[in-house]
Amino acid sequence: MGKENHVFAPAYKEKDMEELVQICDHIIFNSFAQYEKYKEMCRESAKVRKDKKAVSVGIRINPQCSTQEGHEIYDPCGYASRLGVTEEQFREDLLEGVEGLHFHTLCEQNADDLVTTFQAFEKKFGKYLHRMKWLNMGGGHHITRENYQMETLKKLIRYIRETYPVEVYLEPGEAIALNAGYLVTEVMDIVHNDMDILILDASAACHMPDVLEMPYRPPLAKGFEAGEKQYTYRLSSMTCLAGDVIGDYSFEQPIRIGDQLVFEDMAIYSMVKNNTFNGMPLPGIALLKEDGSVEMVREFGYDDFKMRL
């Protein structure tokens, strides 16, 4: 690839590890038991790699410092979390061959939460950083957000580099495509039961599962909070799942069958997490160009549904 390639998983299968040691530069283990299982394979990896360099091994840490509110499903520091080694479970006697430490505890957060997390990490694990080559502080950093505390981040990185002999890594995955992508839907029907309900050709369960899992309310072009404007509707889907509801929105004008509604900030996770529950079609993928023209990149049909079975 010509670039560094890092990988983490809560556990690895042996057949996967045999390939990973050939193509990954950093391999991070979720437990010392997993590290012990593949320690020799990592140590001998230079023999099977094109660059003739052994992989750099890391251990994922759980600093047990929750900074998230409202979406526990994305909190690796929550109760009984399986992700990362706690201070109680840390094995200093097994650190031979370990070159890095890793934590990933944030989700769509600012730099002040990263500082809080690092301080908790440093208090429990800082003494081991002097023996490491790198520190990976994971993802969840909204560094492209308008109000992101960039100076706070810079100050923290400078402190780490001046205090410990480590290279610092960040993984701002979502931030790279923040507020990008649209999901264009059509109103198929309008029914009434306590309130007006729009039946869309899109689905929270199939096309934006984070709406139900996180949960969260996706931004909608020309849509407002329920009750804020004159016309309020519940947006739902064509599946048989009663709870397949995207949310309640209000509009300045009444919505009619055949209208298009456009959800925003849909690039993140939309393709990797979608599914065909109930036979719901996958949304086509189109490219909106700067001149306003649209290029259809990929469309999906029955064969795609069939081949996933």
Locate predicted features.
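Active-site-proximal beta-alpha core segment in soluble small-molecule metabolic enzymes
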Residues: 1-134, 146-148, 156-159
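Charged (often Lys/Glu-rich) extended helix/loop segments that serve as interaction or gating elements
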Residues: 170-309
